[in-house]
Structure formats: structure tokens, C-alpha cells
Amino acid sequence: MYQKYTEDLAPVLHATQLALPIATVAPSWTPVCFGSMYTGVSPDVHGIKGYVKPVITVDSLFDSLPRSGKKVALVTVAKSSMAMVYLNREIDYYIEEYDDAVTEKALELIQKDQYDLIVVYNQEYDDMIHRTQPESPEAMAAFHHHIDAFDRLTKCVKANWADHDAMVVWASDHGNHMNDQDHGAHGEDCPRDINVMHYYGIYPKKHP
């Protein structure tokens, strides 16, 4: 997507300074990937090796930050992997019906500036590739919805978090490929599923 739709990603590139190629873990199922992304350990260690959503019990970012006195919010879609595998942490959960409500809640939290970390999860593109194909009109519309949401979120950070240093991250959990049924899929150890891009933006504190 980065190579083929670079111009479409202009708002993301404008909001960040680093685009980093990442190889996600295998099997590239959503709960497996998020299990490793927020713990830093392999699936063998965090315990999720397929499309299942148990609560992860090993130490994670959602444990270490509260332990260090940081306040964390997780804003995500109901019944998603992110809404389930990191439950029972000392963080604030905002479980919303779908992406639009997630983004609006995240914007509200950014404006209040009461958290050290806000993790925001949207899922429309993944839903659309499974229902259709990776570059179908429906999937591409979802892709652009995610870009627009990130653009709004990062602009909100710039407007409301100028009193302290801030970082924004766009972090995909996996890629996807076309399966034998002509639908988008993932979960295999293949380049299209494993190779993704993460984008990092640093916003220094504005001094008087």
C-alpha cells in the first residue's frame, strides 16, 4: 500500500517523520500480532498462536506504564482483539461500537489531555478486505477513512498537546493477500501478510 498509494498516504507522511518497514510475527492473525506488538515477546511467550482472543497474562505496555505512574487509555471497537486480549489492566477502557465512535472518543480524550498514552484501534479496512478484496472500492474507502482519522487525531494532538513533548504512531498489525476465494485474507507467513509499514511522528514541546 505504501509503494502503490504513496500519494494517498500524504496526510500520514505529513504528520510523521519516519516510515519504517516492519516484519510482523507469524501467523499473522490480529490477536497474535497485537499480542507481540504490545508485549515485545513472541507468540510462544504470550501464548496466542491463532485466531483466539484470551486475556494475555504476560507483562505488557498496558502493565509497565501504569506501574510507572502513567495514565493509559485504550479506545477500541467492541469485540475486537484489542478490546479483549488486554483486559484486566489498570487502564481506562473506552469500548465503542465502530470506528467513527472510536475516533470521536479519542479526539475528546486528546482535547482533555489527561492521559500519557492513548491507544486507538480502527478496523474497517480489515473488515472490508475480508468481505471483498484488498483493493476493492469498499476496502479503499475504508483505507481513506483510516487516513482521515489519523489526520484528524494528529492535528488534534498538535493543537492540544503543545505544552509537552508528544509522539504519534500509525502501526498496522499485519498485511493481507488475495485468497483462493477472491477475498482478502491474512494469517500466512508470506510477504504480503508479514511486511507492513509503521509511521512515527515526534512533536516537541512548544516553548514560550
What residues fall within each predicted segment?
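Feature captures the catalytic ectodomains and active-site-proximal regions of enzymes
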Residues: M1-P208
